C-alpha cells in the first residue's frame, strides 16, 4: 500500500507555527509583492476567500473580517518542508517527495489506520504542521484517499481499499 501525506494549508500552517495566537483565526498568504492570494486557512476559505484573488480587491474584506495577511516566506516554507520530509523519511523505507508539502510513502505496517494516525501525530508534535494521510494501492488512489481524509479532520486518515 502507498500513503500520500499532504500538509494541510501548508503556507498558512507554517505561519501559524510561529504565531500560535492565530490558531482558529482566518489568515491568507499573498504572492510575491503581495499581488494575490496563494494560501488560505480553513477559516479564510469559509469567508469566501478564493485562491488567486487579487489582494487589492479583498483589502476591505480582510479588514472587516480581521483576516491576517502574510507576504510569502519561501525560506520558512522550505525549512518547514525539510523538517516534515525528514520525519517521513524516518517513517518508511521508501519515500517519494511529490512537492514542497506532499510525499508518497510505501506502507509496510499491517495496521494502516494506526500507521496513518501515528504519522499525523508525529509530524504535528515535532513540527506543528497538520497533515492528512490517504492510503491506497496506487499513487492516484492514495491522492483520492487523501482528498477524502481532509474532510475527516478528527482522524485525518482515510484508507481506500477493496
Which residue ranges define each predicted feature?
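Gly/Gly-Pro- and Ser/Thr-rich, intrinsically disordered tail segments characteristic of DNA damage-repair
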Residues: 1-162
Amino acid at each position: 500500500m502507498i500513503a500520500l501525506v499532504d500538509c494541510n494549508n501548508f503556507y498558512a500552517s507554517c505561519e501559524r507555527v510561529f504565531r500560535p495566537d492565530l490558531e482558529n483565526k482566518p489568515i491568507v498568504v499573498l504572492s510575491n509583492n503581495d499581488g494575490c492570494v496563494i494560501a488560505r486557512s480553513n477559516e479564510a476559505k469559509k469567508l469566501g476567500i478564493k485562491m488567486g484573488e487579487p489582494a487589492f480587491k479583498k483589502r476591505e474584506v480582510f479588514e472587516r473580517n480581521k483576516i491576517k495577511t502574510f507576504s510569502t516566506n519561501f525560506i520558512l516554507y522550505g525549512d518547514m518542508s525539510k523538517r516534515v520530509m525528514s520525519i517521513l523519511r524516518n517513517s518508511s523505507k521508501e519515500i517519494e517527495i511529490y512537492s514542497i508539502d506532499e510525499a508518497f510513502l510505501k506502507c509496510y505496517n499491517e495496521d494502516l489506520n494506526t500507521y496513518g494516525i501515528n504519522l499525523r501525530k508525529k509530524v504535528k508534535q515535532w513540527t506543528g504542521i497538520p497533515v492528512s494521510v490517504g492510503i491506497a494501492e496506487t499513487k492516484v488512489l492514495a491522492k483520492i484517499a487523501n482528498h477524502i481524509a481532509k474532510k475527516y479532520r478528527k482522524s485525518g486518515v482515510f484508507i481506500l481499499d477493496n
